[in-house]
């Protein structure tokens, strides 16, 4: 797929990645539907992976065609030799990225192996049911991330640190909005959905479900850190921290997995992330991109966390009937979503980042209407 996909980097750098959004959404939707049908009809994991492979190929192939259409000069360009300085920088950046990504793989993809060892393969399946929902949410969030990373890179290149800081906190607000609303909805709807979908025998205990949801929340509210770090090319600054996080995760997962099973493995990943990346990433950004006191960022995040607790409490106060059908689930989900959104917006009514966010949305809508 790399023979095709490299061209699409131009679309991201040129802030034209929205042209890939419809393609990505269509392919992902088709992929999920086909994978579900394959598992139901054939119970064959190999076919499941083949669907993933084919979907990835077609997504990258057509994305490449979109890039060719937008930048026809790609077919006519003469290839020139890179300077020694350029090669040195590229090699150094690739080394840093390789170290970081290697740590990321250990950090994010060892849980299932350890769960299988300490608890059993059947619990990997139980956990995967919940993880599938989280993955679907994160997939659509990633589409948003891909669409804005290029514009953030351009912003950083302009070296306007005050503007960079303001935009960073707008995105902090945005991902807190997504994180808080989704967290509250998951807290009150997760087990209901699993129960209706595949049955009560596949439900995990409440403590484990809460750990899964908290992990999702922590990941979501750190998206702006990862976006600005990647756009700013700061892999050198954080590469060793990811390795440290991976080592902490592996050690804790072995200890807690042996003692507490599934919940022990999952909470180990959460602890490792909190002890390293969650505070070090924004610290690096505050020192390198917008020269902001780190405590200001922490104060904002604690305020948002307090808002999360209030939103959850207000959702808990609403009486709900037992959810036995998808209609009941949709009705309950609707009220939780509306109530969560209302309280989040109300509690942020004096937040300048919320005001800036609405101004940005209003500007974009006006631009669309003018066209």
Regions from the PLM with identified roles:
Residues 1-24, 46, 213-245, 259:
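Membrane-interface junctions at transmembrane-helix termini in multi-pass inner-membrane proteins
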Residues 12-13, 72, 134-172, 226-231:
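Helix-loop junctions and terminal segments of transmembrane helices
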Residues 21-71, 131, 244-248, 262-283, ...:
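Hydrophobic alpha-helical transmembrane segments
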Residues 27, 51-63, 67, 83-154, ...:
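Transmembrane helical elements of multi-pass membrane transporters/channels
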Residues 45-49, 61-108, 151-166, 284-302, ...:
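Interhelical loop/hinge segments that connect adjacent transmembrane helices in multipass membrane
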Residues 91-94, 128, 160-177, 181-189, ...:
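Interfacial transmembrane-helix starts/ends
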Residues 187-217, 263:
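Interfacial segments at transmembrane-helix termini and the short loops linking adjacent helices
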Residues 293, 315-371:
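Membrane-proximal transmembrane or re-entrant/amphipathic helices at the cytosolic face
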């Amino acid at each position: 797929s790399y023979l095709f996909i490299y061209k699409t980097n131009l679309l991201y750098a040129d802030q034209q990645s929205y042209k890939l959004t419809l393609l990505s959404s269509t392919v992902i939707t088709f992929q999920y539907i086909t994978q579900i049908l394959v598992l139901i009809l054939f119970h064959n994991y190999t076919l499941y992976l083949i669907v993933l492979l084919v979907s990835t190929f077609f997504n990258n192939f057509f994305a490449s065609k979109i890039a060719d259409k937008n930048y026809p000069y790609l077919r006519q360009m003469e290839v020139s030799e890179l300077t020694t300085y350029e090669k040195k920088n590229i090699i150094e950046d690739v080394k840093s990225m390789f170290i970081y990504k290697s740590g990321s793989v250990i950090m994010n993809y060892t849980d299932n192996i350890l769960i299988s060892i300490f608890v059993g393969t059947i619990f990997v399946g139980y956990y995967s049911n919940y993880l599938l929902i989280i993955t679907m949410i994160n997939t659509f969030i990633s589409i948003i991330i891909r669409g804005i990373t290029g514009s953030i890179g351009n912003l950083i290149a302009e070296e306007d640190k005050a503007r960079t800081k303001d935009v960073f906190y707008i995105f902090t607000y945005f991902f807190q909005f997504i994180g808080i609303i989704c967290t509250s909805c998951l807290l009150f709807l997760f087990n209901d959905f699993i129960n209706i979908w595949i049955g009560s025998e596949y439900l995990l205990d409440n403590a484990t479900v809460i750990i899964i949801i908290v992990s999702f929340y922590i990941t979501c509210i750190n998206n702006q850190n990862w976006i600005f770090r990647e756009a700013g090319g700061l892999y050198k600054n954080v590469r060793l921290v990811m390795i440290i996080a991976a080592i902490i995760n592996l050690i804790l997962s072995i200890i807690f997995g042996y003692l507490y099973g599934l919940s022990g493995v999952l909470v180990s990943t959460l602890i490792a992330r909190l002890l390293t990346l969650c505070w070090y990433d924004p610290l690096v950004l505050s020192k390198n991109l917008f020269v902001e006191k780190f405590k200001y960022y922490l104060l904002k995040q604690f305020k948002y966390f307090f808002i999360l607790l209030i939103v959850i409490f207000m959702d808990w106060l609403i009486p709900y009937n037992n959810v036995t059908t998808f209609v009941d689930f949709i009705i309950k989900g609707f009220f939780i979503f509306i109530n969560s959104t209302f309280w989040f917006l109300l509690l942020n009514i004096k937040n300048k980042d919320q005001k800036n966010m609405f101004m940005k949305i209003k500007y974009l809508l006006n631009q669309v209407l003018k066209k």
